[in-house]
């Protein structure tokens, strides 16, 4: 897309569709703090350059020499391993510890492991931000099934259309606690 207005419209559509979260780390993004990411790099398949399903909004993911998300991925791409944000099972393939670390839900899931490493999703700043998000959300204070259910609904479908940063980690912990409470 050569035209600035068309590119801007595309970016706004992606931001809205992704509820203003980075397609990889789920941190809050805006027009100024994101870029249009080609999931399959243009260098690997130029035919997908303008394919909407190949385009996502990614955070800038840079802090000095440290990079994460789209900037860490660069032109690396292993079709058999890299998990697409559009994969219907994407969220289920990752687990989050209370200290913000992300890991494969199934430790034998090579795709999840590859994705975490390639995108540097365990960057110290990301881990700390996920941990803070879980504490701020009250994940570890939720008392009872009803309160957990209310929080799950709140973080799944926000009224303003913008999901809370790192809501995937928040929801993971809430659902994990819900399952634990149900098995007692």
Place the predicted regions along the sequence by residue:
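Beta-strand-connecting loop/turn residues
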Residues: 20, 32, 99-101
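C-terminal, charged low-complexity interaction regions
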Residues: 107-184
